[in-house]
């Protein structure tokens, strides 16, 4: 907090915790945030409730420990205001459901996420993200972001995205 002195921090944290705030998502190897646009609730271009989906995702995955931090983005239309394709997990609303993008990231080596599935229902999206995160947590190297992990899957399987679709949708490994 801007202007706070070091000796004030224990008191400040105590007050925040007492008020119901949590700590950890800003620096842990876990979900950092779910960025959302206004979606159909407040935007004339929105075709799905991106804000509601973002809240659902954040509540479901917050605190989940993983090899590295991961970020989500949820855009309510193809204008992509939440920059979903640049996130580890990105959703872009369509009139028929959600397009799910996986393996994006920003930073020094930015990468667009890859289109995993089109026009999926909200229930299917949750199922695919559950499976994706489980598989990532179980197979990625420590401190490996999802974009680099997907590149490693490309090297190992020829097409990392096709491999993920086989594992997560078709359950080719019998783990889902």
Residue spans for each PLM region:
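A broad, structural surface signal
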Residues: 10, 14, 55, 59, ...
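Generic secondary-structure signature for well-ordered alpha-helical cores
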Residues: 17, 21, 62-66, 130-142, ...
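Flexible, glycine/charged-enriched surface loops at secondary-structure junctions
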Residues: 26-27, 67-71, 138-152, 163, ...
